[in-house]
C-alpha cells in the first residue's frame, strides 16, 4: 500500500507552516516549540522510511544547534545564539513574502487560464480540507508529536519484538469495529495500546485510508492537538 503525503517546497516552507499555526508575529513565536515540531516531523519521516531531502537535514542540524544553546544555562549573553535565531526568523519572514507574491501571481494565471481552457478535474487527497480547516499534513504533524512521545516510552521497554507484518486492511477493520461501539475515538488513546512503532505507523496509515474513503470523519480542534475519529460527520 503506497501512501503519499503532500510534501513541502523546502525546509523554510515547513517552518513557515509551523510558525503560522501560532497566529502571532513571526518574531514572537516560541522558537523552541517550533524547532521541536520540525525535528519530530523529520524523525517521523525517517522512522517511516520515507525519503528526507538533504536540505531538510541541514536545516535540522542548524535548528538542533539553536535549541541546544537555548536550553543551556545562560551565564553570559550569547551574541552568536541571538544572531542564529534572528537570521532564521528573517529567512522565514522573507520566504513568507516571496510565497505570498508567488501565490498571487499563480492565482492571476489560473484566472486567465479559465478563459482559454477547461480546468482539469483532479482530486488530491493530500490537500483535502478537513474539519476546522485542517489538512492531512496538519494531521501528520500532530502524528509526528505522538510518534516522538511513543518512541520515548518504547525505549524503556526492551522486551518488545518488532513485527513488520501489520496489515493496513486489518487495522482499518479494527478501527471501524471500534467506532461501531464507541462512535468517537482519539488516535492517542489507540496508540497508547500499541506495543511497537510499526503498529503505531500502521494504525495511522489505516486511519488516513479510512479518511480518504470517507468511511470515518476526522477533526483536530487545536494546533498539533489530538486527532479525533468519528463514525459520523458533525
Swiss-Prot record:
Its main location: cytoplasm. Gene3D superfamilies: 6.10.250.2410. One of its GO terms (biological process) is DNA replication. GO terms for cellular component: cytoplasm. It is found in: Cytoplasm. Keywords: Cell cycle, Cell division, Chromosome partition, Cytoplasm. PANTHER family: SEGREGATION AND CONDENSATION PROTEIN A. Participates in chromosomal partition during cell division. May act via the formation of a condensin-like complex containing Smc and ScpB that pull DNA away from mid-cell into both cell halves. Component of a cohesin-like complex composed of ScpA, ScpB and the Smc homodimer, in which ScpA and ScpB bind to the head domain of Smc. The presence of the three proteins is required for the association of the complex with DNA. This is Segregation and condensation protein A. It comes from Streptococcus pyogenes serotype M5 (strain Manfredo).
